[in-house]
């Protein structure tokens, strides 16, 4: 009876290498947000270089737009008015998804709507109490850009049909 192991394909290997490199950039940069670079890299490693480039463009644009909306809200809250009631704040943050969604439709980038909203909420919900929310928003955009660049570079390397681990008989 043969028990074959799972085949590890080229795209899987590229993804692992890209994630590792992104996490290493976090060590080099002394950043605790390299996780976002790794996510971007995973999303941008696609079957072909063309598909990767398309995904990278969509990802970068969505991150910049969601990040810009998030940074605007955080700067407003820090400098003008911070809603003291958490329930009301969360309600308003949810309502603020409407202009983000409408903007994505306006610029005909509906495919990036989900990511725009995720980045916006990531900045406004998880970092609402940061001393410098602008820095996190900016770091979030930089990390995504790093992940995209790493993925695009890694995806240029041709990797064969995969590595097949030995199987038992």
Where in this protein do the model-derived segments appear?
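Alpha-helical transmembrane segments and their membrane-interface boundaries
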Residues: 1-169
């Amino acid at each position: 009876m043969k028990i074959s192991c799972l085949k590890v394909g080229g795209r899987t290997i590229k993804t692992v290498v890209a994630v590792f490199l992104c996490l290493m950039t976090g060590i080099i940069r002394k950043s605790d947000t390299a996780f976002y670079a790794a996510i971007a890299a995973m999303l941008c490693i696609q079957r072909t270089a063309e598909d990767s480039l398309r995904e990278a463009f969509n990802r970068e644009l969505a991150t910049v737009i969601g990040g810009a909306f998030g940074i605007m809200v955080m700067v407003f809250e820090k400098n003008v008015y911070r809603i003291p009631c958490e329930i009301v704040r969360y309600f308003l943050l949810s309502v603020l998804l409407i202009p983000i969604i409408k903007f994505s439709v306006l610029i005909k980038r509906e495919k990036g709507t989900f990511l725009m909203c995720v980045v916006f909420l990531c900045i406004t919900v998880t970092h609402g109490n940061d001393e410098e929310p602008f820095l996190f928003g900016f770091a979030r955009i930089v990390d995504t850009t790093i992940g995209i660049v790493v993925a695009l570079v890694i995806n240029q390397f041709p990797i064969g049909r995969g590595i097949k681990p030995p199987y038992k008989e």
